[in-house]
Amino acid sequence: MKQFLLANIKLALFAAFALLIVLYHFIGFQTHYGTDDLMYARMANDLMNGNLLLDDHHFAYRWSILGLTALSYQLFGITDLASALPAMVISIITLYLVYAATRQLNTLGTFMALSLFTLTPWMLFHTDKLMPDIYMSLGSLASIVVVNQYRNGKIRKPWIAGLLFSVSIFFAVLSKAAIVLLVPVILFILVSDLLQKKNVRFWVLSTSILALMLIAYLGILYWLTGSALSRVTAAATSNFFNLSTYAQRPASELIGRITYGLPMLFTEHIFMTALMFSILPLLTLGLRDVFRMSDPKMFFSTITIVACLSANFMSTSFDHYIPMLAQPRHFLFLIPLAAIATAPVLYAYFANREFKNRVLLMSAIIALASLFTGNALAMWTYCGVLGVVAVRYFLPPDNKQLVVVSFFLSFACLLLVKPIDDVLVGIRSNYKSQKHLIKSHLIGASDHAVVITNTVQKTFAEYYQEFQTADNPRWITYAEEPRYSFQPDDEIYVLNNSSTQALSALSYFDAPLYSRRIPKSAEPIHAEQGLVLYRVQNREALIREESIMTESNDFETPNSHWSDYSGSVTSQYSLSGAVSCEVPAHGFSASYTLPFSELTTISANVVHLVCSIHIRTEQVGAVEVVLIAEEDGETKLWHSGGGDSFEPSGGNWWRAVKHQEYDLELLSNATLRVYVWNRGGDNIFIDDFKIEVLQ
């Protein structure tokens, strides 16, 4: 066995990383997204039962993920493992292609490529997720690997290479329309080859086979839906374009997106490690040499850079400039390409100190950029990379195997920083607890059981019930509860899970009061940090918020609840009415004042205060809304909300909303002050200052 491993150490490395992908699921699984992924689960279940509708939902046209997931459900039932298996298999196949593309390298080079692919946090996180991005990564990488293998003579027959290439592209098409980002890459290789009169038969066969596949695909769509372009229509009517379009946004956002936006996003999410070194071998070549790709060693570096440029600049729409939504998962297809391109660069550097100035400079740039991301793990990772690179840079050349291996292992350990943190998050996650709670206490409960919860938790529960909505209990969301017709014999449960509430994009204060406070008459069933289940006899037992006081100020007239602002009123800008209140640079606005003693007569011990202010500023990051509780000149509580949470209202106006709860027993003698703090160098303007107190 030992001799076999020594003789096949690269294959053993591949097997070890494949095992890591499997172990990551069983040890570090955190949760489902609860939205897109479980929509795929629902559609896969529909497909398995022959009920999939090709309507205006573009997810229904992603047949690769739906087909493999439906097959998994057919074989193993609808379980978390069955949902994860297809993605894990796809990830391991992609890992194998990375291994195959770097097998000719030194063992350490192959090790580095496998490490960069597997340990990029977003890639590892998605290796067991029911999402199409990993499927598109496989199709993209497979097509490029086929081209490279044919160019290098490892695939000799052009029709075999053309067929493999076409199947790979078509698989990606069936996975996600974002494959359009690979079009510039394919065109780049095609034009390069045709101008050099190379591989012409391969490209003729590839385009012919792919064209036949696409024609057959459009024919099937026409047969199924009555329109060959039904998928295009579904994508055009989806919310994706609304989320991604820059047509109605300030030009500064567009400029930011296509300049520093994506690199900074990649740095913040530790997505840059494989990408950052891939360009370095090309810096000594002329543009003509880069375009010709005459050196096989430069192929993947060239392809990676073209793919990055496409990802950054290419629009996904013909009507408006709509680049791919700036979320790392949409760009996972870059990681395997970059891993293959970067591995020989790092081997050359750590073994022979090649590219030494470029590697050091690039490491320093990314480490510096990480300091501005606000992500401590990104800072640790990239500053650590800079440290390892710097040590190798300043140490005298030493090609001893032990020294080189030490540098490679040190680099790989840095890649583990975020994955280890993710595993710890998964271990601490309450996903298994909430799943057990639902299965043991709610699924199969009384025919009269109704569970009120957040949107994602409801989706989780329906998934656990295998989407058999007729089964008990009935699930409704917080938003549906006010309109739901309860029956007299209904047993009402409230399930509050802070994790799924966050996935539902609900803040602590967005959820109703009865999700935060258990009524005295309720029957507690389960209570732990962030996960609560209780039962009440009727709807009236649910605790609801009611407004007990509202104050507003548009600064048109004096208001005794605010400090004097007569000298700050201006007609230069206003949101409503004729005037607003000006706040000087590095100064404070008029303060709203509320003695808590005025609230002690109410029945509740805790009140919820909502402050809403409209602010006109061009430096929103330099503005804070401050809520301060003072007693006898001493600050008891201090809270603030910065500009990153403000909502744009148009014309440089922003709406700031700040929520805060106060315990009246602790603050009965204190006074609340609310004001705007302008930390910037220019005057700002405020209007429609509103305070509401709820109990």
Regions found by a protein language model. Give the residues of each.
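Perimembrane helix-loop-helix junctions
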Residues: 1-4, 149-154, 181-215, 219, ...
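Short helix- or helix-capping micro-motifs
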Residues: 18-21, 113-121, 125, 141, ...
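Short acidic/glycine- and proline-prone juxtamembrane loop motifs at membrane-interface regions
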Residues: 34-35, 61, 125-136
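Loop-to-helix entry region of an early transmembrane alpha helix in multi-pass inner-membrane enzymes
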Residues: 59, 63-67, 76-93, 126, ...
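Transmembrane-helix motifs of polytopic, lipid-linked glycan transferases
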Residues: 85-105, 142, 146
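Hydrophobic, aromatic-rich transmembrane alpha-helices
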Residues: 96, 263-306, 338-351, 361-364, ...
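Membrane-lumen/periplasm interface segments of specific transmembrane helices
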Residues: 192, 202-284, 306-313
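Membrane-embedded, lumen/periplasm-facing catalytic core of multi-pass transferases
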Residues: 363-460
